[in-house]
Amino acid sequence: MQKQSNINSVELSRKSEELIKASSNRYRAVVQVANRAKRRRYEDFDNFDEQAVKPVIRAVLEMSDELMQPEIISEVGNNIDR
């Protein structure tokens, strides 16, 4: 069973660099990505279909999207408060 993803390595590299540049502390950015990946791995443990993308790659993509689109974060925060 081979996992395949349609993630472009150049795009992934660019998004990773954006995350690191936006962070004041490179170590903290890496730890946040690792923690999110770990959380996603355990959340998606039952969903074998969604495991085509590795958790670290998914975490980088999600965090990069949140960085580029801050309204995502505010929408999530508003839904949590309700």
Curated annotation (Swiss-Prot):
Keywords: DNA-directed RNA polymerase, Nucleotidyltransferase, Transcription, Transferase
Principal EC category: transferase
One example GO MF annotation: DNA binding
SUPFAM superfamilies xref list: RPB6/omega subunit-like
EC number(s) recorded for this UniProt protein: 2.7.7.6
Single GO cellular component term: DNA-directed RNA polymerase complex
Binding partners and assembly: In cyanobacteria the RNAP catalytic core is composed of 2 alpha, 1 beta, 1 beta', 1 gamma and 1 omega subunit. When a sigma factor is associated with the core the holoenzyme is formed, which can initiate transcription.
Protein family per UniProt: Belongs to the RNA polymerase subunit omega family.
Role noted for this protein: Promotes RNA polymerase assembly. Latches the N- and C-terminal regions of the beta' subunit thereby facilitating its interaction with the beta and alpha subunits.
This protein's name: DNA-directed RNA polymerase subunit omega
Lineage: Bacteria, Bacillati, Cyanobacteriota, Cyanophyceae, Oscillatoriophycideae
